[in-house]
């Protein structure tokens, strides 16, 4: 799969996230050398902005301090994205950062590293829960 980085320097959160591509997935890790999914979003936000977000994917996804985006089509570069990988009632157990062009960056337990994945037309489209706009 080929990814385009033409947008990469347009958003500071994406710039930070891209620096960590290929770093290993480790459950409960919050960086900078390894991450789990919410540790990755937590670390990137904390590094770039003057605020922190909740630590777990569930708490990040349900934090009503930030605008909720219910449609993939409404996502903007830098939005956090949340997925229901377990397909259970909480609807929010995986987190990543939308980087544009139908792609998001995340610490993937399946891929065992920080990676970029597409949303539409993939497994992730079917389990997309919502996004949150931080700024």
Label for each model-derived stretch:
Residues 1-24, 73, 123-135:
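Intrinsically disordered, low-complexity
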Residues 18, 28, 54, 82-84, ...:
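Residue-level detector of conserved, well-ordered beta-strand and adjacent loop positions
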Residues 11, 51-114, 135:
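...with weaker cross-activation on analogous glycine-rich loops/strands in unrelated enzymes
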Residues 115-119:
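A short, polar/proline- and glycine-enriched secondary-structure boundary/capping micro-motif
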Residues 19, 23-77, 126-127:
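Catalytic cysteine-centered active-site loop
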Residues 40, 96, 131:
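Short hydrophobic/aromatic patches on the structural cores and recognition surfaces of FHA
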Residues 14, 37-38, 93, 128:
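A generic alpha-helix preference that emphasizes hydrophobic side chains
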Residues 6, 30-34, 120:
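Alpha-helix initiation/capping motif
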């Amino acid at each position: 799969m080929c990814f385009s980085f033409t947008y990469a320097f347009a958003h500071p959160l994406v710039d930070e996230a891209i620096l960590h591509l290929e770093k290993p997935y480790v459950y409960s890790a919050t960086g900078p050398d390894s991450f789990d999914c919410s540790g990755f979003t937590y670390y990137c936000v904390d590094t770039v902005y003057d605020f922190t977000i909740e630590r777990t994917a569930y708490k990040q996804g349900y934090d009503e301090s930030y605008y909720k985006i219910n449609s993939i089509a409404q996502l903007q570069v830098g939005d956090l994205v949340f997925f229901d990988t377990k397909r259970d009632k909480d609807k929010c157990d995986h987190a990543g950062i939308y980087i544009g062009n139908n792609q998001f960056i995340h610490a993937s337990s399946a891929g065992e590293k920080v990676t970029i994945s597409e949303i539409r037309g993939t497994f992730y489209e079917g389990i997309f829960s919502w996004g949150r706009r931080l700024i």
